[in-house]
């Protein structure tokens, strides 16, 4: 994303989110940057975003069992994490928290649904008795399926950037602590990656060099066809989702927790007319990622939400569409900062919707 993107103008806090960098972890592939500190967004040593209670207290996840008898969990991707929230106390998890029962933010930026499930499995020893598990998800699986050349493996799903996550600079984290050479190589990879992301001229040079150096190198170990259609990849994702729901149901029952699935908000998945700022931000993204239009439209939403609801019902999991909380809003209200990230007001609306459905 260019620094000239309108999000930086309308939401200056976005710079702090933009500067965050994922950290490699086995099986989940990455977590949010651990121990990240800034004016708008902060994470703990586990990469979990800070949750702030109504009284102003910070929730210490490793010490949860010492301070609370029970907690709620909300899990998903960057919308749950709270990208573009103006503060840690303006996220959905903080809005859902009470001073007695915190809601822990297990939002992992860029995570697909399998990664969400795995992250919960790794984090669950940290929690006291779990009262509610809220899954707020949906867009990342659709976005991955819409990307040209993305891979969705039968029975395994897929992740964003899986080619680079098997090469540089992320896998180098495995050996970074063992010797100085690995550490220096890791620093070099990260420096190249950041400049490639931020500097168009540098990016063009790297592409030209790689095209000459490796253009004729044969491909190997292709496990699936990269030309698979959006519809076929989406079909694979939905089949995988059904398997995940069975696991989620068993995990929730083992904790004695109430489990609900909430389809997350997305541009054009509701009846809200876009505000001037929303149209400007989404329009800028659409120029760079035209594949967004494949899923960010009313017809796709109607079909996809129906399919997810059926899988939820088959697993015995209540399904709710949070886009209903936005349907009645007009173009005078800013809710989206891009295709699926929310303003503070949007986070509050979604939190109120989740709370209402969970307490019904």
Language-model regions, residue ranges each:
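N-terminal secretory targeting modules
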Residues: 1-71, 86, 126-129, 146
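Serine-esterase "nucleophile elbow" of acetyl-processing enzymes
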Residues: 51-109, 113-134, 342
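Short catalytic/ligand-binding loop motif for oxyanion handling, primarily in non-cytosolic enzymes
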Residues: 81-84, 112-114, 141-146, 267-273, ...
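Conserved, well-ordered alpha-helix/loop/beta-strand core segments that scaffold catalytic motifs
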Residues: 133-137, 204-327
């Amino acid at each position: 994303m260019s620094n000239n993107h309108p999000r930086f103008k309308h939401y200056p806090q976005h710079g702090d989110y933009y500067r965050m960098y994922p950290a490699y972890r086995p099986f989940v592939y990455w977590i949010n940057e651990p121990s990240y500190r800034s004016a708008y967004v902060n994470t703990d040593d586990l990469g979990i975003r800070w949750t702030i209670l109504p009284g102003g207290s910070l929730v210490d996840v490793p010490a949860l069992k010492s301070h609370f008898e029970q907690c709620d969990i909300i899990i998903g991707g960057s919308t749950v994490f709270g990208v573009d929230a103006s503060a840690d106390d303006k996220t959905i998890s903080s809005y859902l928290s009470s001073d007695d029962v915190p809601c822990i933010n297990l939002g992992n930026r860029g995570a697909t649904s399998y990664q969400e499930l795995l992250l919960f499995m790794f984090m669950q020893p940290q929690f006291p008795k779990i009262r509610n598990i809220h899954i707020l998800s949906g867009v990342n699986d659709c976005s991955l399926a819409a990307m040209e050349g993305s891979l969705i493996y039968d029975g395994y799903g897929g992740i964003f950037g899986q080619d680079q996550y098997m090469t540089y600079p992320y896998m180098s984290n495995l050996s970074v602590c063992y010797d100085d050479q690995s550490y220096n190589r890791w620093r070099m990879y990260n420096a190249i990656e950041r400049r490639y992301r931020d500097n168009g001229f540098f990016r063009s040079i790297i592409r030209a060099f790689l095209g000459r150096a490796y253009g004729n190198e044969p491909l190997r170990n292709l496990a699936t066809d990269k030309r698979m259609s959006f519809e076929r990849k989406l079909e694979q994702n939905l089949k995988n989702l059904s398997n995940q729901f069975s696991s989620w149901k068993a995990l929730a029952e083992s904790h004695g927790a109430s489990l609900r699935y909430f389809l997350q908000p997305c541009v054009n998945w509701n009846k809200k007319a876009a505000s001037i700022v929303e149209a400007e931000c989404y329009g800028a993204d659409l120029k760079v990622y035209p594949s967004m239009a494949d899923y960010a439209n009313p017809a796709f939403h109607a079909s996809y939400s129906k399919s997810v609801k059926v899988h939820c019902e088959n697993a015995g999991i209540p399904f709710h569409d949070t886009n209903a909380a936005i349907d009645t809003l007009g173009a005078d209200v800013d809710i989206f900062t891009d295709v699926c990230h929310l303003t503070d007001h949007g986070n509050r609306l979604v939190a109120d919707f989740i709370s209402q459905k969970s307490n019904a």
